[in-house]
Design a protein with these regions (language model features):
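Acidic/polar active-site rim loop that often engages polyanionic ligands
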Residues: 103-108, 140-151
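Alpha-helix C-terminal capping segments
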Residues: 81, 126-128
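Glycine-rich phosphate-binding loop
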Residues: 89-125
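N-terminal active-site beta-alpha-beta segment that forms phosphate/nucleotide-binding
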Residues: 2-99
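Short, well-ordered beta-strand core segments
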Residues: 97, 101, 131-133, 151
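Single conserved hydrophobic/aromatic residue that forms the stacking wall/gate
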Residues: 153-163
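Residue-level signal for inorganic ion chemistry
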Residues: 45, 111, 136
Length: 163
C-alpha cells in the first residue's frame, strides 16, 4: 500500500515573503557555500526557507550529498518536501549553520530569534564550525528594538537555582 502525505506536498510559506527578490539572491549565495558531505544547520524564517530551495536545486543538479539539521518543524517539513536528507544534533555536528537576523544596527549588533525555534537556533550556532547570519536591507535599523522587542527566554530546569 502506498501512502502520500498531502500536507508535505502542498507545503508553502505561511505568510507573504517580504523582499523576496533580495532574499532569493542571498539564498543563492548561501547555497553556493555547500560542499559535498557538509552537515548544515538551518535556522528558521523565510530566508532560510528560500535557501533550502536553492540548496535542493544544487543537490539535484550536482548530485551534492549534504545533510540538514533543521531548527524548527516548519524547516524540517520543507526539507522533506524538497528531498533534503536530515539529521540531528544528537547524531552529527554541523559544519556550518545559516540563519536570519531580526534586526541589525549600524555596529553589526543584532537581535536573533523571536520565535519558538530560538533555543535550537542557538544550539546550532554554538555547535557549528562557522555561522552565516543572513540579512537583507529590511533588517537594518538605527537602534536595536526599533521593530521588535528583544525576547528573553528561560529554561525551566534550573529555575529553582535562580530564585
Amino acid at each position: 500500500m502506498e501512502w502520500e502525505n498531502q500536507l508535505i506536498q502542498e507545503l508553502q510559506w505561511s505568510n507573504k515573503i517580504s523582499n523576496k527578490a533580495s532574499k532569493e539572491l542571498v539564498a543563492q549565495e548561501i547555497a553556493g557555500l555547500a560542499k559535498d558531505g557538509d552537515v548544515i544547520g538551518a535556522g528558521s524564517g523565510s530566508t532560510v526557507y528560500l535557501t533550502l530551495f536553492a540548496l535542493a536545486q544544487r543537490v539535484k543538479q550536482e548530485s551534492l550529498h549534504i545533510e540538514i539539521i533543521p531548527a524548527s518543524a516548519e524547516i524540517s517539513m520543507t526539507c522533506i518536501q524538497l528531498g533534503l536528507p536530515q539529521t540531528t544534533l544528537w547524531n552529527k555536528r554541523p559544519d556550518w549553520t545559516f540563519d536570519g537576523a531580526d534586526e541589525v544596527d549600524p555596529h553589526n549588533n543584532l537581535i536573533k530569534g523571536r520565535g519558538g525555534a530560538m533555543f535550537k537556533e542557538k544550539l546550532l550556532i554554538k555547535s557549528s564550525g562557522k555561522t552565516y547570519i543572513i540579512v537583507d536591507e529590511s533588517k537594518l535599523v538605527s537602534k536595536l528594538g526599533s521593530k521588535y522587542p528583544c525576547l528573553l527566554y528561560t529554561s525551566p530546569s534550573p529555575r529553582d537555582r535562580t530564585r
